[in-house]
Amino acid sequence: MCGLTYLCVNPTFLTMATFLNFTLKELCASDIAKKQNIDNFPSFTIAKNLEELTEKLLQPLRTAWNDPIRVNSGYRSKALNDAVKGVQNSVHQDGFAADLYPSNGKIDEFGMFVKDWVTKNNIAFDQLLFEQSGSSKWVHFSLYSSTGTQRRQIHNITVK
């Protein structure tokens, strides 16, 4: 399903997964990291976690949805997670979560689709959170919890 290209950066070898619809670059992109000059490049282990997240959740979801999905937030280094005021044990830091938004802008329809898709297809995951902050909405989708479990939690969350 994916091809791997190994990159040598500051003698650490990192994996670059190329899936049909997602890239490592996209999963690590952050405007806040750019603005605050925060290094948000993952280790080899975290890149492999992002690959697993993509292979098991993101790409199958994108294929089922059959329309582009934007990753608003994927991997976050500890410094970036602190900058965005993420929870201390956020699995974004481990490469096991992504905040998603459908490119067509139909976030409520997308949220219902994801909920139905995980239920009907018995998809293994940790959390499916429908998050909102003011008028902004997104879907948080994680593969594992910080303890490695898959709790299959589905919640609505208001972020302050």
For the regions a protein language model found, what residue spans apply to each?
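Acidic, His- and aromatic-enriched active-site or binding-groove loops in soluble protein domains
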Residues: Q88-E109
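Catalytic cores and adjacent binding grooves of peptidoglycan-active enzymes
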Residues: T12, P102-K160
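Single, functionally critical "micro-switch" positions that shape active/binding sites
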Residues: R76, V91, F141
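Short beta-strand
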Residues: N72-S73, V91-H92, Q127-S133
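Extracytoplasmic cell-surface/polysaccharide-interacting catalytic and binding patches
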Residues: Y6-R62, R151, H155-K160
